[in-house]
């Protein structure tokens, strides 16, 4: 059993420890955020950080949702979906994404976008099963 909830300011120290465990499971390209970066994220009006808590209240998953306005409407994007490797396959990722979809819709977003590494086969199957469609577009990145 697990609970999906938004993070509040008092969760920041615990989240710091959880991200030190979770972010390396997601990517080797970026280090876990510092406490200052977590606090800045929590203060952002456009960002919602969702976490999954296990029965023992430990953080076993997280997801970042950004909802923002552009001239053509309200957009939303999911980033950094991660579930602890020890509890994968229990529906935690699905519950996180479903809650993010609800929040984005409540905030007036016309659609929700996400990207996923093709090597993350389970995650890609989940997104397709939840109704996401592959976009016929090029994704670009510019690194500073």
Task: State what each model feature region is.
Residues 1-13:
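Conserved N-terminal entry element of GNAT/NAT acetyltransferase domains
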Residues 97, 104-116:
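Conserved GNAT acetyl-CoA-binding A-motif
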Residues 10, 19-32:
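Helix-loop element at the rim of GNAT/NAT acetyltransferase active sites that forms part
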